[in-house]
A protein has these predicted regions:
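Sec/Tat signal peptide C-region and signal peptidase I cleavage site
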Residues: 16-22
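Hydrophobic helical h-region of N-terminal Sec-dependent signal peptides
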Residues: 9-16
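N-terminal secretory/targeting leader peptides
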Residues: 11, 23-113, 121, 129-322
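Bacterial N-terminal signal peptides that target proteins for export
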Residues: 1-9
């Protein structure tokens, strides 16, 4: 018995002394190299490697290399991808509170949105994502600016969208929003959009200026109309399958670095918006600013009524944030 005990102790000592295997985390995003989200995540990876002496590293797969958002989320849920930055649309069905952030004209402006996601409400929504059946861990938020409609003609009021097929993200709330604004909302993946604009499958779409510019949509649609109908934060999540394989210290470190990435991405975002506006102007894009936002706000009230009826207290808290 004594000999067995010594062998057991020796084995335990060897196990404790053995170095932990290095782990390369796989991160993915639909946006190209140099995009604010990509840079912020790459910097997170560098900090992670430095803090763990390269025991934990990160490899970024940008530009839809691993598929569109829907595909990447599914891969993360299965443990095939570790970290994904995504829009909130796909989370609506499993975390109903997320749809509150997706409602048109919820936030007064981008500063209001940032104050909300930086505070208790932002943390609560991340916790709900983590606790949901999505098999993902909510790490942090990223700015995605203000979404505006881009088309082949100017849009100033709801009547101007009549007969226009406008691509929307894959969430019924967004399709309902465009229908209420006067257009015809078409749910479509991002990977299909450029060719669909070229061939006339859709007449336009809506997104922020950096995406409009980096995805070269301006080569097809020359009117960028400041409808300002959506100001939506985006979320980056960790596969819970992968997360549960990490020790508590590594989990805490990743959460800390994620909060830092959230703030860093914001600065990168603001700089990129200015750069994109300059590029759009140089490429001959007409930016329509004299939009009747009050008319669009009024037109989308039924959408807020429909999707916000169960979350009146949460909406009131959001609106109270200064």
């Amino acid at each position: 018995m004594m000999r067995i005990s010594k062998l057991a102790m020796l084995a335990a000592a060897i196990f404790v002394a053995a170095p932990v295997s290095a782990l390369e985390l796989k991160a993915a995003d639909v946006h190209p190299e140099g995009y604010p989200n990509i840079v912020a995540m790459q910097n997170l990876g560098k900090k992670l490697a430095a803090a763990t002496n390269s025991r934990l590293t990160m490899k970024m797969f940008p530009n839809m290399v691993l598929g569109d958002e829907k595909s990447m989320i599914e891969q993360a849920q299965a443990g095939g991808i570790d970290i994904v930055r995504t829009s909130l649309g796909p989370f609506g069905p499993v975390v109903p509170e997320v749809n509150v952030f997706n409602m048109p004209f919820l936030f007064r402006d981008e500063a209001h949105m940032r104050a909300v996601i930086d505070g208790p409400i932002g943390d609560e929504i991340l916790a709900k994502i983590t606790a949901s059946s999505a098999n993902l861990v909510g790490l942090g938020w990223m700015d995605s600016g203000t979404r505006n409609v881009f088309t082949k003609k100017p849009i100033r009021k709801p009547a101007d969208l009549a007969g226009q097929k406008i691509r929307m993200m894959g969430n019924p709330l967004f399709v309902d929003t465009m229908n209420a604004m006067g257009g015809s909302g078409i749910s479509m993946g991002m990977a299909e959009l450029y060719s669909s604009l070229q061939t006339g499958v859709v007449d336009g779409a809506e997104n922020n200026e950096p995406t409009f510019e980096t995805q070269n949509y301006y080569t097809v649609n020359k009117f960028y109309n400041h409808t300002g109908h959506l100001i939506i934060p985006e979320v980056f999540v960790f596969s819970k399958t992968s997360w549960n394989k990490l020790n508590a210290e590594d989990q805490a470190l990743i959460k800390k670095l994620s909060k830092e990435a959230q703030q860093e991405q914001r600065k990168l975002w603001d700089a990129k918006v200015l750069q994109s506006r300059a590029k759009m102007k140089a490429e001959g894009v007409t930016t329509v600013t004299d939009v009747d936002k009050a008319a669009f706000f009024q037109a989308t009230q039924p959408v807020r009524d429909k999707y916000g009826k169960d979350f009146t207290a949460l909406i009131a808290r959001i609106q109270a944030v200064k």
